[in-house]
């Protein structure tokens, strides 16, 4: 399967660079189990879900992971904290005119907090902070909004690039689980009143989510690694949902990857799991847990577009995307949403 199989034309003006005034005011394109698409508003999910269905949400929180700083010589640098190893050490991306060497001292924030580059780990730098990382990020960091916004983070992003249900103890992502950004408290309450249940997994989203596929044959692509947790409580609810004949609805590709990673770790069995995942889902993959997926519209030739193409199929997804472009849906992180049903065989 070739990378070019997942290409489509997207006018730049359809990229949503700011959120709508109301989270749940987005549009929704439903791709059903027969491969037919239907236009809705996002709040119509109340009618598209059944009592007893289960929503699986990713409760991670986005860090203010981007730090501006300088070298000892005064040259500008930028650090993006990818993964914290402990309170003071992290794997980081560093933008600089020249790559810093092991032992280099850098300074971040307005108060010039010292950090030291300790070495490399694959394509990342191992960076030791002189103070605990999270307070430094909270005081001096910026939210790492996606590069396709083509702007700096603003005050509106502080609220709107986080989910309303994030767990403040789970602050470790460098990108939001964006399908969840459509849910506000009112919509969640209405789903609860209908009897739609909800549960949580955790997947800390890494910057690799924005990395392009660079191999013509997509099967040669190596996925980035992300930490996830699928707890026993969630597994119990999934098993009960399937026993009732109801649907498991993953909210976002991150929740999907967490659930399917847990299943793959147990040979396809539905069971709890915690660990690092590099799962790459593309057409031909057999889903073990996910029946339906809520997701945003994704970049051409991205691994996320490949994932959604595995749940329906590539032709159906690209036809739905073509319709979305013609009908002026809003794309990417702050854009509109899709509800995709697993294709009936």
UniProtKB/Swiss-Prot annotation:
Cysteines paired by S-S bonds: none
Record GO cellular component, one term:
cytoplasm
Q: What class of enzyme is it?
A: transferase
Q: EC number(s) in its UniProt entry?
A: 2.4.99.17
Which SUPFAM superfamilies would you find in this protein's record?
A: QueA-like
Task: Please name the GO terms of the biological process aspect recorded for this protein, alphabetically.
Answer: queuosine biosynthetic process; tRNA wobble guanine modification
Q: Where in the cell is it found?
A: Cytoplasm
Q: Which UniProt keywords apply?
A: Cytoplasm, Queuosine biosynthesis, S-adenosyl-L-methionine, Transferase
Chemical reaction(s) catalysed: 7-aminomethyl-7-carbaguanosine(34) in tRNA + S-adenosyl-L-methionine = epoxyqueuosine(34) in tRNA + adenine + L-methionine + 2 H(+)
Please report which protein family the annotation says this sequence is part of. Answer: Belongs to the QueA family.
Assembly description: Monomer.
**What is the role of the protein in this entry?**
Transfers and isomerizes the ribose moiety from AdoMet to the 7-aminomethyl group of 7-deazaguanine (preQ1-tRNA) to give epoxyqueuosine (oQ-tRNA).
- HAMAP family named in the record: QueA
State what protein this is by name.
S-adenosylmethionine:tRNA ribosyltransferase-isomerase
State the species of origin.
Acinetobacter baumannii (strain ACICU)
User: Taxonomically, what lineage is the organism?
Assistant: Bacteria, Pseudomonadati, Pseudomonadota, Gammaproteobacteria, Moraxellales
